Amino acid sequence: MAELFRPVEHERLAVEEWDESRAEEAIRVIVADTEATFDGSRWPWHPGDGEEDEDPNDVYFGGAGVIWALHELGSTGWEDAALTFIDRQRTRPVLDEFTVETSYSFGELGIDLVAYRLTGDAGVADRVHDLVLAQPDSEANEVMVGTPGSMLAAEAMLAWTGNQLWDDAWNAASERVEAARDPDGLWTQRFGAEEARYLGPAHGYAGNMRAFANRGRAPEPANLEPHLLREDGLANWVSREGSRPDEIRVQWCHGAPGMVATLGDLLDLELALAGGELTWRAGPLAKGPGLCHGTAGNAYAFLVLHRRTGDELWLDRAHAFALHAIGQVERERAAVGRGRYSLFTGDIGVALFLRHLLDGEERFPTMGPFDP
């Protein structure tokens, strides 16, 4: 029997009756704490996010992602902070292939995009445009670092401005991404001497397809059967071609939750349901409540399936994961003595998921489609 998930990476689901006011209060507490903890320059680093970064500015770990979420949650007054993050990022050395200036999640591109959303500054828009067109030789081929992320940035700017310039920029980026596709429909991600072919939304196929599908231009899907694990009505996808059995994941970034949340409208319905069922059976993630590899991120798969099928079962499951994620936020805050301040791994991402759940919204943050 194939191992579709590893129980040690999951928790027993907390049994709690759904209460909308509990979710609203959790949002209020998280937003208030996040606003109050900002020291005018940054939020404190969390030990769960690895080696401390003195000045985290980016969308994934840093301040830009936090203020993106705060803005979406109705918090105001972050324009100066957004511009500060840009200035600070431009003086930082590029540490590795992930922090290049054209990176959507870890570099200047995403920070500039957030700053434009908050300020409408024409100079910032020009810089976003330059960065979108600055990746002709990128071999990252993933949304977080490579040209697919430039597609998302151009799509967002088109939605926010209506300017044809951004349609042209999107087309230029999309042509590069399509040209980089492998004959079997996957993409190869290359970072220095390292090479892999990932399946999930953060680093591979699903995210790239989403960047096309947001505008109704998804190319012919790849045959993912060689990378699919099935058993008793459940389904999961390996994280990358040739993954070892002990590398199986059930997360947004890698595995069934992210594949369903990102490609739920493109997948065969039976397969999407099998991926959702696997996500439910595996249970909340022990890694924490966040978006990238946490309980809230996994629950987006349920929201997508609820929208696609109309079956209230999936909404009930999203409610259950939401309550569990709230409990995880509260326990972690008590253990560490403060919150966790990042969009993809922290509390504010959970708050944004809760807002989406309450508002009937299933779009995963930063992945589009984007509203005007």
Q: Which residues fall in each region the model found?
A:
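Terminal, non-catalytic domain-edge segments
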Residues: 1-36, 214, 265, 304, ...
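Well-ordered alpha-helical segments within folded domains of soluble proteins
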Residues: 6-9, 56-72, 102-117, 142-158, ...
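Structural signature of alpha-solenoid helical repeat scaffolds
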Residues: 18, 51-54, 58, 96-99, ...
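Extended ligand-binding clefts on enzyme/binding-domain cores
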Residues: 164-266
